[in-house]
């Protein structure tokens, strides 16, 4: 006699056992019978579409191998019997209920799910496109403002109005970046902010293309800069809140810099292609409109919400579903998904503990002030070394050397082509770890010599101008391999993972304001100083040599203070590979009482001990007392412990001070034996 079948939504388990090989076929048959009985056209009917097979967990049999079928268009669920040999998990596991809710939430979702590869590729592509916006604008506007059609339409603007037209986009980006750094948008959805930024960018691009006078052009370029800076800042927050294990952060930064170079070359040749048409200055600028449409579509349909933001909003179920979709194609049982969720949850707790009720990024100003000053110095020297002057005003410089309007634009295009080809050939070396101090020092020396040579071009014959453009290409290449990405790479080299995003946000403000200042005064200085102008960036390069010799930190030469793998949950620690292996093994079920937190170290050494992968004995001695550093200040050691029980679903962790008597027994119980098991605190990476 056939056992009764439970077709209700209560999902009560059946008592009859069934072989695992027949589970799927039987589930399909039961689902088809249910569909035929309901006679509802809204339900998915077999065999036209197979229902999703999923792993179901009820309140009694956690992590069982029960399988069922669920229609996307209804809540009807078919539950199959449980085998008596199925391994069971303790009811006290706090991850179990969240896992069950996440699986059900994902299966009942009617949204189309993309594969993990598509989602990761879309995210990386979006980051690269946003990072190339500035380079594209440099290429488009540098040649555009010197075309005859632009000069006639805007009544031959002088050096000061020309500087305003070129530089105002950087001013808008600075104001948007400063607004993001203010912390006002911290509670806002990352995805919505990205969508708003791309819409502002598109609006600015349209106003710029349809400009009727200089004021409309300035307004359009200002809005373009606001959208650019807004998107750039939100991408920084997004990529550091949700780093992908398939690509290292250092590699992603290098790829962003390369994409900016390619976009610059693309913008230059767009100008060359349309310069003979009527209203030739409008067609190249319309490239911004096309790119804005692409970014809008990607932000709406391919970019997911930041799981860290979801965890901040206590939406742990949605965060787990999102992590599973990105990393394991929706498979919640993979260790990578579970460990990534736990690591992000730990980071959110750490950051909330550091921020408390104060300004969101206040703690970095107190604890990393010396590093921040160093990074700001890098940005100042990078922008004043002459790179922005050549990128924005290369056609203007060549015209002052005696070349005509047409030849100056084509020589700039040749310059950009050589620049891009050499950079692409150098990409494999850029992505590898290098001796940063030696590299930056040699680059400063070469740039100083090149700029000093270019300053004497007024005495050269006019026929040698083409060779001067080659010197520009050599200068730009030298700058790229030495100074272009160092200000950003140093951030991930010197700072712990939790502080990298806010520090980069702060440094990006100075990046935009320095860029605005240089692009504003360059045409004025070129007009008034002539050949003496090149002595200014030459002097800046000479100061860079002294800066590198005296101030450049030595920590990045041999080993990094923070691990990309630690931030993504990857314990492989293989830094020789550019791309990490997505299939690398992950430690299972880490003991959260093993994570120790040293709050707010006042020096690089203390922060290294607090945040890097070190042994617990370096922070907490065996006698249980708080250790004193060489600086004489006692460290506050905290523990992240697990709160079990169904009443705490979604909130598994809490902070406890080491001296709290309520957890003394728990800490002693979690102390590893002399044998040292797999999850012993001595083998775990601290936050």
Curated annotation (Swiss-Prot):
Listed transmembrane segments: 123-143, 165-185, 193-213, 217-237, 252-272, 284-304, 411-431, 440-460, 470-490, 501-521, 534-554
Origin: domain of life: Eukaryota
Region spans: Disordered: 1-22, 561-587, 654-687
Gene3D superfamilies: MFS general substrate transporter like domains (1.20.1250.20)
One Gene Ontology CC term in the entry: fungal-type vacuole membrane
Extracellular side stretches: 1-122, 186-192, 238-251, 305-410, 461-469, 522-533
Phosphoserine sites (modified residues): 90
Residue ranges with Polar residues bias: 7-22, 660-673
One GO MF term: carbohydrate:proton symporter activity
Residues in the Cytoplasmic compartment per record: 144-164, 214-216, 273-283, 432-439, 491-500, 555-687
Principal subcellular localisation of the protein: membrane
UniProt membrane topology term: Multi-pass membrane protein
Gene Ontology terms: biological process: carbohydrate transport; transmembrane transport
Alphabetized UniProt keyword annotations: Membrane, Phosphoprotein, Transmembrane, Transmembrane helix, Transport
Compartment annotation: Membrane
Similarity remark: Belongs to the major facilitator superfamily. Sugar transporter (TC 2.A.1.1) family.
Name assigned to this protein: Putative metabolite transport protein YDL199C
Originating organism: Saccharomyces cerevisiae (strain ATCC 204508 / S288c) (Baker's yeast)
